[in-house]
């Protein structure tokens, strides 16, 4: 079956936002107006088409990015729904990898919120072209112009309005379209499906003229001919202006800003028009790079004629189909029944069922093309971030980097049957979400779950109980401490056991020193003249690595350390890789003690938004949690407090804050860095763990 839509007519985009800015509602309306969804699902009632996990429906937050296909104005839209809660930033990063453009949704009442900054920065990191939609214009306190100022102040970006609101709060009727210089006015009867194009209201004429000028001036900067014509008094026509706005979006020169209210069905169609007009097709963004099986860089263009390559970006467990792997096809054509290679894991797979996903129903397809986002059922080996490709033209597309978890809990199944269910469930959850890790505590034998925050783990536990019916006891959350040496030391150690039979002999001298934070572990052999034969060096490395997982302060992983092997001795008969491993292990442990190892604790960046009346209590409380206040700011009529607080002092903070502010204050936190723990904290932790 030939390709039905030319690749330049594809728009692979996501909707990114702060929690509660109305992202899911906006996606819902897009599906409604593109004719895919017959009944509008309201998040308030927990029935949105995109939010299809029970946990999401209850919490009213989007957790898993479901990919959906819809059509508008002859263009094919692949919409990737991204979560907006900070504990799920990994999902946002992952979906930003596979989309070409994004709509950033702001709550017009709140402006730019903490999580907006986070997802915006991730968008910057992956150079995602964006347009901005100021949602909730019907809310009390909605302020479109403050949103524009916020984008400059808080995101450091350049916004250019393409629309101005007509009326505000409950009188919000529509918007002035600055490209066409017309007013779009909605009548409330037709669920937003109908709007009238009329002349700009007289009271907005001056403002419209002022902002139209700003738009045209920003646009003509991108083209010398247009600039010359403009200076001669000729304004660009509509087609030229749109072309220039598109160029601005693709280059990041400025960000077009639109407004509306998705909940009240106003402004969604012009937003769709803007997606089609300004966001990139797969041909407008740089081709993806990867490495071939010889390690050379290769480029894969969005072209059906190129060898097939696709990236798995999301894995889900579906009760009807089994494991579903969401993939973006970067090049070539994929047919069901073909054999592919998972080049990341060097495993072969066969493509079984191929599905095109609508938020919660699916359509079987036989063939998919470059630019498509498809769901593959029944892949055995694929994990998030893996590349699947043509066996004759192997490539590994860019690797995704996943952050280390900062919080952990122990989980104990209540019965033997639960134990079995838990094993299966955890394997699936870990495959679906690389920022969620599972390990076993060597000493206690307990299963440890590790994640990015309390909410992250709460939801995983909830899924275990509901979806997989595992009955288990959950321990209190623990902080993921780390250890590091603070001074450079040189240390020698000799291991010998030479009493009858085969003996063991190895001597090593190590230099152990702290490296820059975030550098991790580095090893270097500086052996000259064969003091330690080459074949024993892996034994030395193994010895070091066995200590790294459990340091000398309280048994936590050792980070940011550089180890050099500078000297050693060996015996022709009694030396072995094992002897060198044992010697190095002892030498490294003693060096860590000599090098004054300290305990590091994760420090979280916390932002609290609170009504003025509670500011004093909030700051006092943060100080009592060893928080360092970084600054305060006003946002609307609320006070914004930024602080750095140790994670170990933030457990249960949500309930505390709620009771302190009568439920009116909110907070977000995310991992920022590791810092040395004070002596009293270190002593307490050592008593508990060492």
UniProtKB/Swiss-Prot annotation:
One of its GO terms (biological process) is ribosome disassembly. One of its GO terms (cellular component) is cytoplasm. Pfam families: EFG_C, EFG_III, EFG_IV, GTP_EFTU, GTP_EFTU_D2. GTP binds at residues 17-24, 81-85, 135-138. InterPro entries: EFG_II, EFG_III, EFG_III/V, EFG_IV, EFG_V, EFG_V-like, EFTu-like_2, G_TR_CS. Its main location: cytoplasm. Catalyzes the GTP-dependent ribosomal translocation step during translation elongation. During this step, the ribosome changes from the pre-translocational (PRE) to the post-translocational (POST) state as the newly formed A-site-bound peptidyl-tRNA and P-site-bound deacylated tRNA move to the P and E sites, respectively. Catalyzes the coordinated movement of the two tRNA molecules, the mRNA and conformational changes in the ribosome. Belongs to the TRAFAC class translation factor GTPase superfamily. Classic translation factor GTPase family. EF-G/EF-2 subfamily. This is Elongation factor G. It comes from Nitrobacter winogradskyi (strain ATCC 25391 / DSM 10237 / CIP 104748 / NCIMB 11846 / Nb-255).
